[in-house]
């Protein structure tokens, strides 16, 4: 179920504070965050945010198409390497 419109978008306060500081200083340094639950707002466009995926921070450049999505959608947490190969099929 989507979030109620009267509540507005959710962005962690510490992340929003870092975004405004980066905009004021025109910093190109990535903003590190563990807040995968935060929504991408128009203020973040053009910034690089390093989103934690459980092991490392994945740098994500914010674009206009990403507005309305959550940060965690762009930092994959699972690493699928394929199914184990069948030994009998390899010998043939």
UniProtKB/Swiss-Prot annotation:
The entry's protein name is: Small ribosomal subunit protein uS19
> What are the GO MF terms of this UniProt record?
rRNA binding; structural constituent of ribosome
Q: What InterPro entries does the entry give?
A: Ribosomal_uS19 (IPR002222), Ribosomal_uS19_bac-type (IPR005732), Ribosomal_uS19_CS (IPR020934), Ribosomal_uS19_SF (IPR023575)
Q: Which organism is it from?
A: Francisella philomiragia subsp. philomiragia (strain ATCC 25017 / CCUG 19701 / FSC 153 / O#319-036)
For biological process, the GO terms are: ribosomal small subunit assembly; translation
This molecule's function is given as:
Protein S19 forms a complex with S13 that binds strongly to the 16S ribosomal RNA.
Which family is this protein grouped under? Belongs to the universal ribosomal protein uS19 family.
UniProt keywords, alphabetically: Ribonucleoprotein, Ribosomal protein, RNA-binding, rRNA-binding
Q: What Gene Ontology terms describe where this protein resides (cellular component)?
A: cytoplasm; small ribosomal subunit
Tell me which Pfam families the record gives.
Ribosomal_S19
């Amino acid at each position: 179920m989507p979030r109620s419109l009267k509540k507005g978008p959710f962005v962690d306060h510490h992340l929003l504070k870092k975004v405004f500081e980066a905009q004021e200083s025109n910093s190109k340094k990535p903003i590190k965050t563990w807040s995968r639950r935060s929504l991408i707002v128009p203020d973040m466009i053009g910034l690089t945010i390093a989103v934690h995926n459980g092991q490392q921070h994945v740098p994500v450049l914010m674009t206009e198409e990403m507005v309305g999505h959550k940060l965690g959608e762009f930092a994959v947490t699972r690493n699928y390497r394929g199914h184990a190969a069948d030994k009998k099929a390899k010998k043939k």
